[in-house]
Amino acid sequence: MASFSLPHSATYFPSHSETSLKPHSAASFTVRCTSASPAVPPQTPQKPRRSPDENIRDEARRRPHQLQNLSARYVPFNAPPSSTESYSLDEIVYRSQSGALLDVQHDFAALKRYDGEFWRNLFDSRVGKTNWPYGSGVWSKKEWVLPEIDDDDIVSAFEGNSNLFWAERFGKQYLQMNDLWVKHCGISHTGSFKDLGMSVLVSQVNRLRKMNKPVIGVGCASTGDTSAALSAYCASAGIPSIVFLPADKISMAQLVQPIANGAFVLSIDTDFDGCMHLIREVTAELPIYLANSLNSLRLEGQKTAAIEILQQFNWQVPDWVIVPGGNLGNIYAFYKGFHMCKELGLVDRIPRLVCAQAANANPLYLHYKSGFKEDFNPLKANTTFASAIQIGDPVSIDRAVYALKKSNGIVEEATEEELMDATALADSTGMFICPHTGVALTALMKLRKSGVIGANDRTVVVSTAHGLKFTQSKIDYHSKNIKEMACRLANPPVKVKAKFGSVMDVLKEYLKSNDK
């Protein structure tokens, strides 16, 4: 078609090729000249609405499964090729015979019957829909998560599909970066990325209970976000939830969530590592299913955030992805999601990963600085504003090391002052982030300053929770109420008398200071 300038009365209509879900193809357009009257969009056939007495689960039962003969099993994590040890996902098992972590292994031979274009088109076709269960960002990748679970057993709040936004001002003004993005996993059902994994875990528990497996309730140790997700998804399914929390070490916003959702909450006089030790002992004795990231099912949901990032970039691979790390399951989950996409032909490479830790809880950072040559040494985590990653003995240390080695990854740390300043700086550009994202941004700033991350590198910072869960830390910072911290970016309210002249004086001074 010859190109030419269009009059104002011309209307663009996507051609058939644009709407056929073919990735990497440039959009082509048909141009129709119209009269001055308002353009009438082309009529598309509407999907018939289901009958009033039918819900979306009923509708899903009538829909045949698109793909057959896909499966997944538990296997020992990073086992040698000669290993034959494996377990059905319907077994209640958390570790291998040797005590090693487990991993969910998918049947790649079956998945490879379909090429990368097929998977890209399938996943893209489900975005923005309300078909059960594909309206979820997790379950829109069901074939790569729990391929054998019945749709009726799935417990979902249509989590995932979280915002990936361009951090334009922060990137340009403070880092001289043009391509900085934030994947805001905190925009989710309970306000953190933990929803992704908990939907998968509670769905499998729902299936196990229907199979009369010995599961009365689900339990977890938590620094806040895990308990919020567990209690919400269990409440949705009518399954009892039991939560072990370290006393006086999480925010009130985090504490109120499991309480409101009806969880049985134990506030225990210890830290997270102590709670984790106790819940593992308890679940070994009682019919309580363990929901911590020792359980590899959670990571199957969390890996979908990595797939979403690729999808949101039209299947182009970013150069860097920076993930806050505490118990360290999430850094491995991101690696696994990227690796599956490469292995199955959706992309041709994976990004480099950065795990960001608080300096007050930095066992992985210290292990990394040793070149991973020395034996890993857990430590006693000190108090950090990034409370969800205040963990000194991470369960997934082996998974994290594996992911970092495979992705040519880096580990960086942030002091309390650095993470709070980074949080305040990001907030001043229109974000409202959690302290853990402040840790990740600090890592980015250090790597940018050292030249490891370039000005033109497409970089994604993973924001793991919503800032509204951590308002007290923001209040303390802007009130300059944090001991031994300058709070140099504090923005406290200005007290002024209720007089026009007083208000005008203050405003003139403010405007003068900003007129630079």
Swiss-Prot record:
InterPro entries: Cys_Synth/Cystath_Beta-Synth (IPR050214), Ser/Thr_deHydtase_PyrdxlP-BS (IPR000634), Thr_synthase-like (IPR004450), TrpB-like_PALP (IPR001926), TrpB-like_PALP_sf (IPR036052). The modification N6-(pyridoxal phosphate)lysine is found at residue 194. Allosterically activated by S-adenosyl-methionine (SAM). S-adenosyl-L-methionine 3 binds at residues 172, 178. Its EC number is 4.2.3.1. It is found in: Plastid, Chloroplast. Signal peptide: none annotated. PROSITE patterns: DEHYDRATASE_SER_THR (PS00165). S-adenosyl-L-methionine 2 binds at residues 163-164. SUPFAM superfamilies: Tryptophan synthase beta subunit-like PLP-dependent enzymes (SSF53686). GO terms for biological process: threonine biosynthetic process. Catalyzes the gamma-elimination of phosphate from L-phosphohomoserine and the beta-addition of water to produce L-threonine. NCBIfam families: thrC. This is Threonine synthase 2, chloroplastic.
